[in-house]
Amino acid sequence: DDGYISRVTVSSTGYGNGLYITHPDGTTSIYGHMHNFSPEIARLVKERQYETESFNVNIVLDSDVFPVQRGDYIGNVGNSGSSAAPHLHFEVRQPDGSGPVNVISAGYFEHRDDVPPEIRRVNFYSYEDSTGLVQSELIKSFRGSSSKPLRVSDKFYVAVDAIDRQRGTPGKLGIEAYEFFLDGESVYRFELGDYTYKEQETFNSLIDYREMVRSGAVLVKSLVEPGNGFTSKITSANNGVFCLDDEDVHQVKVVVEDLDGNKKVANFKVKRGINASEDTLKYERALPWFAPYAFARKGVKVSLPVMSLFRSESIEIDTVDVCGEFYS
């Protein structure tokens, strides 16, 4: 809707050619990776580039310089900045700049979604923390439901890789809510909603980060680590750890839900029958997640501010002799 261009940026990285439009309700819409600006905006950019003798510019404008209305031409979609292919980065930010607005739930676009999400993988992991340092191993990975009882450790957790789809677009969309059940009782529920950039910094605490690095898959896990920044959006029992104290067969249900309430369910049976890994960690020092950490010895210095870690970790330090022969 109506507003004014409040900022224009040009950079060889990031958004490249970017426009920021501030609206009467205080929100700011962002248009990144543009190919070009309208002639009036391009003229202003060129003047500032000559004035500063710099290609990169960041121009902040008052409300009376470039007022705009719906339908006005501001530029073309492009591939500028840190972009792998032509597209428009469109984003709306909250009035206080603390985070993005969910443009679908806020009604910026009309859409009809009756397509349920797609579960691509469900992983089961053993869990052991008797030493204060969590140890876990992958027990088994599934592509969907399984009726055969899976033998698990008496403590375990679950993670799921899922995406959402909508009719009329091949794009892969995010999941709005994840929930894990044991015998019908909720063990973990995470509902995204609106979030802040501060919360976004701890996104890796929600997922199996090691698996994302290894394969690129993003699996949201039931395990709630102590440094998780999304705890206000999470309801869990026993920090998302499933606990079995008998030899019976138990039911595990995984539910993912999109913004329109469409759900996909995967069901599993589990039975206690394997031991979690014993404490075989070999480490020199333990790094607490809740405190700053500093360590130094000849040739090595480690310094971590408080809350650098999502959970306490171990560290083993070794040195490599670099005085050997080198060849050109």
Model-based region annotation:
Residues 277-280, 316-328:
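Proteolytic processing hotspots in large secreted/extracellular or virion-associated proteins
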Residues 18, 77-88:
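Active-site loop architecture of trypsin-fold serine endopeptidases
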Residues 10-13, 74, 78-82:
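Short, charged beta-turn/beta-strand-edge "cap" motif at the junction between a beta-strand
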Residues 39, 69, 112, 125-274:
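Long, low-complexity serine/threonine/glycine- and acidic-rich segments characteristic of extracellular
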Residues 291-315:
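Predominantly extracellular/luminal regions of secreted and cell-surface proteins
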Residues 3-5, 65-77:
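A structural signal for short beta-strand/turn segments enriched in small hydrophobics and glycine
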Residues 2-61:
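Zn2+-dependent peptidoglycan hydrolase active-site motif and core
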Residues 100, 114-121, 293:
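Proline-centered linker/hinge motifs at extracellular inter-domain junctions
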